[in-house]
UniProtKB/Swiss-Prot annotation:
Annotated protein name in UniProt: Aspartyl aminopeptidase
GO terms of molecular function: identical protein binding; metalloaminopeptidase activity; zinc ion binding
Cofactor binding note: Binds 2 Zn(2+) ions per subunit.
Signal peptide residue numbers: none
Subcellular location: Cytoplasm, Cytosol
Positions of Zn(2+) 2 binding: 263, 300, 437
UniProt keyword annotations, A-Z: Aminopeptidase, Cytoplasm, Hydrolase, Metal-binding, Metalloprotease, Protease, Zinc
GO CC term, one of those recorded: cytosol
Function, as annotated: Aminopeptidase with specificity towards an acidic amino acid at the N-terminus. Plays a role in membrane trafficking and is specifically involved in the recycling and degradation of endocytic cargo.
Entry's EC annotation: 3.4.11.21
Length: 470
């Protein structure tokens, strides 16, 4: 039972290590989505085209992607009929990071540099003095066709050095200018052969597909090599910087996870793992619900995109799953449904104890955290909290509760967005962590097992729990 397991238990260690194996590959939303897709295919899921016809059958398993950076997987219960409900767990694939600008070539004092944009609310000071690599999606032309290529350089190729303290006028604070001081070094003029003869620019029609003048040739050549093409074949790119220092299990008792992108690859991974685990028993054959795990992009910047939680993508999918019933089958299904928004939660920081509300202090190994905010920054209600408590009791997974101080700002999640857009009963939860939005975050090993077990039981038991609520 999850509640009785110590951090050293084999089940805890195994789940944490499997998550780390995933995390070290999921270096961008594109890579995370591909990793999830591979897991689903191995588990017997069928990919559905968003633009094609769907023929949904009971006890079958499917998934659909959006922009290659968001994915929605669903397993149709054996007793499902249009108008039955949805059991949904939602995470997101993105994290605060630096992303390469469309025109990235920069240089200063005999260094070639790469221009980057800040994505989300990162702790940007933590990106200094790190061995950075680059990964993402590259679109190349092949005759009249455009092909998508997923690339990961893996090797450290970029570096943002700190200014020596001897040159600082203010040695007590560090607030870098994110436009002028957050510019990664690529290489020196000397190494680049900057004085070598340059190819003359064409004076004819400028092919808009050719981006060779937008980036340093050395940088674009590196990307082209990874994509298996020539630099002039690259039409566009969507590249992310990341720390090459891999995630790991750390601590004297091996009880912690240290790594990048815990917010929110933990939510994405455990949502999918919970779904897959729920399908191994007999409950799926008799379940009237459709079990759904959704992983959206762009949560860190407000979710307002085609692949974000604010789009109509989720509604369109749910409506298609309700097709074939009465004209109000979709609306009927919403009333029989519940959604868990799985996004990381703040553990109580031992060095900043006063930042946390005195009676709501999530701890490592203390269980999945339920987020409550009366101003609707989180979507949890007493009804959804009670339903989750019943699920947690049956799963034997401990729960914690977090409320922010009245004099403190509060973050938010996709929970209120989807609750508002779809009218879904929603509960906001997350696994406790420290250093949220740093380039390297810190969590406990127990969370992966606890969250996976909770979500698996949620999928298996939700229809019964809801039917027993009066």
């Amino acid at each position: 039972m999850a509640a009785a397991l110590k951090p050293s238990a084999p089940e805890i260690r195994k789940a944490a290590q499997e998550f780390i194996n995933y995390l070290n590959k999921a270096v961008t939303p594109f890579h995370a989505t591909q990793e999830v897709k591979d897991r689903l295919l191995q588990a017997g899921f069928t990919e559905l085209p968003e633009s094609g016809h769907w023929d949904i059958q009971p006890t079958s398993k499917y998934f659909v992607t959006k922009n290659r950076s968001a994915i929605l997987a669903f397993a149709v219960g054996g007793s499902y009929k249009p108008g039955s409900g949805f059991s949904i767990v939602v995470g997101h694939t993105d994290s605060p990071c630096l992303r390469v600008k469309p025109i990235s070539h920069q240089k200063s004092d005999k260094f070639l540099q790469v221009g980057v944009s800040t994505y989300g609310g990162g702790i940007w000071r933590t990106w200094f003095d790190r061995d950075l690599s680059v990964a993402g999606l590259v679109i190349v032309k092949n005759g009249e066709k455009l092909q998508h290529k997923l690339i990961d350089v893996k090797k450290p190729v970029l570096f943002i050095p700190n200014l020596a303290i001897h040159l600082e006028t203010d040695r007590t604070t560090f607030k870098p200018n994110t436009e002028t001081e957050l510019r990664p070094i690529l290489e020196t003029f000397a190494a680049a052969g900057i004085n070598a003869p340059q190819k003359p620019e064409s004076t004819g029609f400028a092919d808009p597909r050719n981006i060779t003048n937008n980036h340093h040739p050395q940088f674009l050549g590196l990307i082209a090599k990874e994509a298996g093409c020539q630099p002039e074949d690259i039409v566009d790119l969507d590249l992310y910087l990341y720390d090459t220092n891999k995630a790991a299990i750390v601590g004297m008792e091996d009880e912690f996870i240290s790594g990048a992108r815990l917010d929110n690859q933990v939510g994405t991974y455990t949502a999918i793992s919970g779904l897959l685990e729920s399908l191994t028993g007999e409950s799926f054959k008799n379940d009237p619900q459709i079990r759904i795990a959704a992983c959206f992009d762009n949560e860190e910047v407000g979710s307002d995109s085609a692949m974000g939680a604010s789009s109509s993508f989720t509604e369109f999918v749910l409506r298609r799953l309700s097709a074939g019933g009465s004209t109000t089958a979709f609306e009927e299904a919403i009333g029989k449904s519940m959604l868990i928004s799985a996004d990381q939660a703040h553990a109580t920081h031992p060095n900043y104890s006063a930042k946390h509300e005195e009676n709501h202090r999530p701890a490592f190994h203390g269980g999945v955290v339920v987020k409550v905010n009366v101003n609707q920054r989180y979507a949890t209600t007493s009804t959804t909290h009670a339903a989750l408590k019943q699920v947690a009791f049956e799963a034997q997974v401990p729960l914690q509760v977090v409320v922010v101080r009245n004099d403190s700002p509060c973050g938010s999640t996709v929970g209120p967005i989807l609750a508002t857009k779809l009218g879904l009963q929603t509960v906001d939860v997350g696994c406790p962590q420290l250093a949220m939005h740093s380039i390297r975050e810190f969590a406990d090993t127990s969370s992966i097992y606890q969250a996976t077990t909770l979500y698996s039981t949620f999928y298996e038991r939700l229809s019964t729990v809801l039917s027993n609520m009066q």
